[in-house]
Amino acid sequence: MSIDTAERYRRALETRDVELALSAFAPDAVVRSPLTSRVRFTGHAELRPLLEVAYSHLRDVRFHTDTGDEATRVVVYTARIGGEEIEEAAVLKLGEDGLIAEVTLFVRPLPGLVALMDAFGPDIARRNGRTFAARLLAVAAKPLLAMVRSGDKRAVPLAGPRR
């Protein structure tokens, strides 16, 4: 049963099918943000706008790993958000009914994570009726994204092995 649920989760993301995704989640499922432990989305009413925003921004989704058992599955994929490549791991904790009860998301590399924040944050805030927060988030993430991209390109390689 868990493999079917993980397959629905995967297929929903690949095809951007929000209804299919919601069918894989328990009605009171929780999604934990990859950005902070202070934000989570609970239940279909909160998951729907999150999924709509995610599916509107993620491109070239390619799953490469699906492993686990009847209680927990881990699916990992690569995608693009804006000009950044990301790799996301989703830890899917399944309920006794085989539906997703909880998802914890992990995203790498840092420029991709910040690009995700830059794209998703304002859109999610807007869909939640928080227009001022949406404007603030749209402005606040830009310098962070520029700094992270610059550091990733110029500073981080200085710590790596000489080649």
Which positions does each model-derived feature cover?
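C-terminal and inter-domain tail/linker signature
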Residues: 1-163
